[in-house]
Swiss-Prot record:
Name of this chain's protein: Proliferating cell nuclear antigen
Major subcellular location class: nucleus
Subunit structure, as described in the record: Homotrimer. Forms a complex with activator 1 heteropentamer in the presence of ATP. Component of the replisome complex.
Record's comment on post-translational modification: Monoubiquitinated by the UBE2B-RAD18 complex on Lys-164. Monoubiquitination at Lys-164 also takes place in undamaged proliferating cells, and is mediated by the DCX(DTL) complex, leading to enhance PCNA-dependent translesion DNA synthesis.
Glycyl lysine isopeptide (Lys-Gly) (interchain with G-Cter in ubiquitin), cross-linked positions: 164
Record gene name: PCNA
Pfam families per record: PCNA_C, PCNA_N
Record-linked Gene3D superfamilies: 3.70.10.10
Lineage of origin: Eukaryota, Metazoa, Chordata, Craniata, Vertebrata
Keywords on record: DNA replication, DNA-binding, Isopeptide bond, Nucleus, Ubl conjugation
CDD domains according to UniProt: PCNA
Length: 262
């Protein structure tokens, strides 16, 4: 039996919004330690890894490990029926072919009960190696989303150049080019408004903006985002989910563009 109750149900709604445009179906791994998901996107270019720890839920019970195949569009549609203030409970029997979703208003006066059909999915687990990164940039998540959105009007790829004093985002396209430079902030009252850079060596890498714009759908999950980069390994875009876990997106750099000198 699996049952998880989340008083702040809007977190779960935001998690689905962050996933559903990138991956259509995925296997949710339910265990005593929490819920996790790992999936390549449908074009096998990027990877998503999500962790929601059991202690982040208000009550959590999972008697045995369950792999639950879920159509994320279907789950998102059902979660849209929950109000932002609703308490959400997820429930499944051990060998169930459905997941129950229960939404309660805070005053308990309205209870909505949905059942979603589960899928049989063959999922290969990819090992994600632990990695030391040359540059780690932490910045406001809304700022990163804005940069990706703005530069996607200029070109379809962004060059991210990271140095000790700042990080630069550049794009080239038919209409010209655009460059946005963020300097490391020296003193900020609110930590979530800071730009901090930890650099072992400078990095300049090119990434497809189409995927970064998918990743930034996770912006409502966290006020900050962390970008971890090294030459020849995938970029990691990480959003911390307060007290619960994280969503990490991995995207390999574009190589052919760099050889053409762009």
């Amino acid at each position: 039996m699996f049952e998880a109750r989340l008083v702040q149900g809007s977190v779960l709604k935001r998690v689905l919004e962050a996933l559903k445009d990138l991956i259509t179906e995925a296997c949710w791994d339910l265990g005593s330690g929490g819920i996790s998901l790992q999936s390549m996107d449908s074009s096998h270019v990027s990877l998503v890894q999500l962790t929601l720890r059991s202690e982040g839920f208000d009550t959590y019970r999972c008697d045995r490990n369950i792999a639950m195949g879920v159509n994320l569009n279907s789950m998102s549609k059902i979660l849209k029926c929950a109000g932002n203030e609703d308490i959400i409970t997820l429930r499944a029997e051990d060998n169930a072919d459905t997941l129950a979703l229960v939404f309660e208003t805070p005053n308990q006066e309205k209870v909505s009960d949905y059942e979603m059909k589960l899928m049989d999915l063959d999922v290969e687990q990819l090992g994600i190696p632990e990695q030391e990164y040359s540059c780690v940039v932490k910045m406001p998540s809304a700022e990163f989303a804005r940069i990706c959105r703005d530069l996607s009007h200029i070109g379809d790829a962004v060059v991210i150049s990271c140095a000790k004093d700042g990080v630069k985002f550049s794009a080239n396209g038919e209409l010209g080019n655009g460059n946005i430079k963020l300097s490391q902030t020296s003193n900020v009252d609110k930590e979530e408004e800071a730009v901090t850079i930890e650099m072992n060596e400078p990095v300049q890498l090119t990434f497809a903006l189409r995927y970064l714009n998918f990743f930034t759908k996770a912006t409502p999950l966290s006020p900050t985002v962390t970008l971890s980069m090294s030459a020849d390994v995938p970029l990691v875009v990480e959003y911390k989910i307060a007290d619960m876990g994280h969503x990490k997106y991995y995207l390999a750099p574009k190589i052919e563009d760099q050889q053409e000198g762009s």
